Amino acid sequence: MNKDNLIENYAVALFNNAMVDNIQDKIFEEITAINRIIIDNFDIREFLFSPIVNKDDKINVVNSLVKNTKFNKIVNNFLLLLVKNSRTAILSNIVDAYNTLLYESKNIKIVQVISANKLQPKEQEWIKSRIEKELNQKTEILFDIDSTIIGGIIIKYDSMLQDYSIKGSLDKITKALKKVRIAA
């Protein structure tokens, strides 16, 4: 099974368990918090991700951690499952996939907008309203910065890519010029 399918399977399983009790948002908050703890704490991350550390030791540590938390039992069991199956390294990917499922269940499309510089709130609102109008759907916009695009924006959602960047335009011009034959 490839990594993307594996991630999707774990995310779907977690989401389906959350749906039983109608606590999808709560589970997302909790799994995101756990992921943040692991990302922010070098010692915990190294311990959980290390192939050298005995799996039983990892399970014992996670068991003691989850007993002292107020996280939902679904989250605790899910974390233990990841440890038992040596899948803690893909937790961040699972959280992202779960987030996508959560938005899809609310009929909200996740859209990534990349700009060369940080956009002002008014610019972000304008872009969001234009995208929602074009898609005829509510959106969750993730604004990212990539100075290599020089200017303009790139919009990504699903398998679509709309490149309105200066770099993209220059790349198209370069490609077109390479095809031109100059007669001597």
Swiss-Prot record:
It is found in: Cell inner membrane. It holds the Pfam family OSCP. Disulfide bonds: none annotated. The keyword Cell inner membrane applies. GO terms for molecular function: proton-transporting ATP synthase activity, rotational mechanism. It is a peripheral membrane protein. SUPFAM superfamilies: N-terminal domain of the delta subunit of the F1F0-ATP synthase (SSF47928). This is ATP synthase subunit delta. It comes from Rickettsia felis (strain ATCC VR-1525 / URRWXCal2) (Rickettsia azadi).
